[in-house]
Swiss-Prot record:
Protein species of origin: African swine fever virus (isolate Warthog/Namibia/Wart80/1980) (ASFV)
Family, similarity comment: Belongs to the asfivirus I177L family.
Protein name: Protein I177L
Keyword Kinase listed: no
Residues glycosylated per entry: 11
Induction (record text): Expressed in the late phase of the viral replicative cycle.
Alphabetized UniProt keyword annotations: Glycoprotein, Late protein, Virion
Amino acid sequence: MWKVNDQGFLNISVTGTKFNLIATTGKLGFYTDPPSHLIVIPLKIFPVHKFSKNEPNKKQKRFIYF
């Protein structure tokens, strides 16, 4: 289950452990509740969807899969 809290963070609850997902410009991070470690991941490690040569005018977008 997930929801966005008042601070704009994405809270993901997995079997009693709450993960807080922080999405900022160019970085993605998450930490557990209670906070143990903050992990910040550059978005460059996520695969970028590549369009075919028939669609050169469309901008590339980053997709994050959970």
